Amino acid sequence: MRRVYIPKSNGKERPLGIPTMKDRAMQALYLLALEPIAETLADGNSYGFRPERSTTDALQQCFKILVGRKSAHWILEGDIKGCFDNISHQWILDHVQLDKIILQKWLKAGFVYKNQLFPTETGTPQGGIVSPTLANRVLDGLEVILNKKFAITKRNGINHNPNVNLVRYADDFIITGKTKELLENEVRPLVGIYG
């Protein structure tokens, strides 16, 4: 895999992995098998790099959870820094339900930069066809954890809704909450443990 760097809007550079044509074809075939499995396990409010979902869908969900009279008043915004570069190979190998031999070869293939081969111990390259789906598999599950921990409960016959909702687009997300304290003291530590 060849490594190139493209400029980001903040002045930094983003590393991209450019697979060979053979690797691209193999990854496309692998993705045909992986994507249906990943879709059945995906968080309902995950919108990045998924079929039939877009930024518009993510924005509509944000609007839906934020405009009601009883909607949350606070938002925790998150961006998982270096998400693609820091994904655990072992987690992927343990949790992706397809052929591990091929997957491990891709993950450990390394990259070439300035005619020098560099090994890869973590991460999945941005630019790889299967990488966005692998990243989503790693990030899926947070919504389920939040929904279990912050479910609507009844106290003294009155519904108590903490208004905790997750909307994720790739490695960027927002989590809503009824109070700032709820987000800071309960949600944020949970997100930190998950990540």
Model-derived features with residue positions:
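Active/ligand-binding-proximal structured segments within catalytic/core domains
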Residues: 26-34, 134-135
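Generic detector of ordered secondary-structure context
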Residues: 21-22, 54, 165
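Charged boundary/loop elements
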Residues: 32, 36-48
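Active-site beta-loop-alpha junctions of metal-dependent nucleic acid enzymes
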Residues: 51-57
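Duplex nucleic acid-engaging cores and interfaces of nucleic-acid transaction enzymes
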Residues: 22-27, 59, 63
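Conserved polymerase palm-domain catalytic core
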Residues: 3-4, 9, 44-45, 57-195
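Conserved phosphate-binding loops in nucleotide/dinucleotide-binding enzymes
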Residues: 15-18
